[in-house]
């Protein structure tokens, strides 16, 4: 595994703000174990670009948000025809490493067409990865990649999940969720705008 990595592409297909936030442990981990100049970040976030606005205070210093990939890149079969040429958007010939943080085979086959030197993906138990190590995929989305990298570098780094939250957010939360107010919170999985969801609220 190359220790000095100039350009990494990190693919996080989850488009929600929590998907971006949950990727921080992994982003910080790879910054810790590798010497990285540019950490390119792509997410199917409907042009929300979370690390450029609402999550800017958590953004790693070397993170560069990709804003010019095709919409929903990787989810459509026709993207296979454009994957290789996407490297022309950058001032280098190939990525030193692509980290594909998802498990859909169709998507991974499309992402892997982007020119690269090394490619890591948990898809099909890391079978598409280069370098490949026979391993059992961890159910934890963050640990499955960290454990794989640890096996490659033959070390046992542990991720840090600690995130420092600014006082302005804590104070706002206290106002919204004061002891005198009752509230109900909804966490709807796969709540992407392209997926229609309906639910009926009934008085309990």
Enumerate the language-model features and the residues they cover:
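Catalytic machinery of carbohydrate-active enzymes
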Residues: 1-204
């Amino acid at each position: 595994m190359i220790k000095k990595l100039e350009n990494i592409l990190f693919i996080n297909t989850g488009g929600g703000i929590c998907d971006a936030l949950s990727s921080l442990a992994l982003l910080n981990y790879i910054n810790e174990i590798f010497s990285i100049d540019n950490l390119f970040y792509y997410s199917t976030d409907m042009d929300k670009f979370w690390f450029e606005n609402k999550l800017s205070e958590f953004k790693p210093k070397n993170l560069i948000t990709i804003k010019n990939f095709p919409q929903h890149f990787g989810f459509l079969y026709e993207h296979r025809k454009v994957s290789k040429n996407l490297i022309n958007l950058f001032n280098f010939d190939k990525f030193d490493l692509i980290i594909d943080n998802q498990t859909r085979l169709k998507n991974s086959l499309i992402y892997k067409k982007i020119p690269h030197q090394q490619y890591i993906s948990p898809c099909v138990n890391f079978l598409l990865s280069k370098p490949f190590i026979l391993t059992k995929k961890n159910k934890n989305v963050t640990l499955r990649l960290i454990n794989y990298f640890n096996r490659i570098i033959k070390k046992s780094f542990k991720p840090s999940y600690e995130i420092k939250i600014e006082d302005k957010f804590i104070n706002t939360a206290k106002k919204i969720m004061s002891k005198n107010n009752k509230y109900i919170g909804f966490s709807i999985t796969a709540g992407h705008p392209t997926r229609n969801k309906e639910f009926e609220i009934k008085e309990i």
